[in-house]
Amino acid sequence: METLNYKVLEGTGYNGYILKDAPVKVMQFGEGNFLRAFVDYFYDIANEKAGYNGKVKLVQPIGNFPQMADWINEQEGLYTLYLRGSEKGQKVDAKRVISCVSDCVCPYIDGKWDEVLALARSANLETIVSNTTEAGIAYTQGDSQFDQVPPNSFPAKLTRVLFERYKAFNGAADKGLTILSCELIDNNGKELKKCCNNYAKDWNLEPAFIDWMNNANTFCSTLVDRIVPGRIRDPQELAALEEANGYHDAVLDVGEVFGVWVIEGPAELEDKLPFKKAGVNVMVVPDVTPYKKRKVRILNGAHTGFVLGAYLAGFDIVRDCMHNDTIRGFMNKMLHEEIIPTLPLDKKDLEEFASAVEDRFNNPFVNHELMSISLNSTSKWKARNMPSFLAYIDEQKQLPKCLTMSLAAYIAFYSSDIQERTADGLICKRPAGNTYKIQDDAWALDFYYAHKDDTAAQLVHAVLTNTQMWDQDLTKIEGLEAAVLADLEKIRTEGAEAAYKSCL
């Protein structure tokens, strides 16, 4: 079977949107599945819907997989993207051939770093995008030199690219770039800017350049939200798709339908970027923090809030939980009545985000295992659920029923017929009879193993007073110890599903 390129695609009779030739306006550090299913998808829609007329040049931030660049280039930048999931309760399986990518370069191959620097000198270049993993935004003194081909770290590469542009345009203020950092760390844009400043100082670059770098360029922190499985794992399904498409695609990509990109920047950036006009789910806001809080407390908080009890009730994957009226009802009540009222964003926006969560959890293409979500639940409950729990008590002057029950479910999950403490986990037995392995910090597992013979009352007291877990003594919250004990006993005697139902 022929490999995808423009000629092969034309021969298949594909009638979707395609843009073959356009100037390169975006330099993207990162060629992986996530950026291609997320950022490049948005740029592709912008070409179609907003007349952006721009291509994205991919730059591999590390040199350990140059074959990926070869695959992308053999396909002339084209690749097939499937967005799969559930939207408003309906199954979605949408295919689009993405044509916004010009090519991909591995700067560690002879001559290719020069290609990157040449793009830095281009008047057409407007934006730099990056996703170089959480470890990518880092500064280590002396690890990268100005004249290295290329410098080792990503921030060092970026500093060198910006200096090349500064020189090419004699420090013109209107030739600065918008830099959109997608790495999964807090304040990613601000951290990247700090690293670039450190390299500029290490390399003794002229003060006028440092001034231009900081003031003519806009370093944006961004929040990304789309689950990207990245590939189709079933070889038979993949073969059937290639047969239907009429070509082989070495870099085919798969993402969920839901996707939102929140960019922290000045208001005028919204008109500078092509996304608003394209009508895609990208927003420019003065502060990304409330949106991060929204994601952590609603999306992640929902997961941690219901999955532990759901597992004890006999469920194994998230989608099946969404098909159960009790579990789904418990999650929705927790979200809409206990979590959303404590968040500092527009209520309509929060309600829509929460509704999308149910669709995302109901994705017919993803078997998201409850046990994989259960990893490190002690720190997860503290980070994702406790802030909503405490804020609700502070505002409503009463205990939130569902969040209190979820705390009891956490204790029940960690103490269900404990069998043994192994080197890498705590082996428990669920009511259905099978054993399961809890994975968490060693001190948390040691705590539950040490308390395995406690009465329910002793265990609840020990958990709530454990300041290593919660940074405070939760028994000081009026009525909480008695409520958690009652909920734990209900889970143990009537089952977790019945306990969840009692909250509705």
Predicted segment positions?
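Substrate/ligand-engaging "lid" and interaction regions
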Residues: 1-504
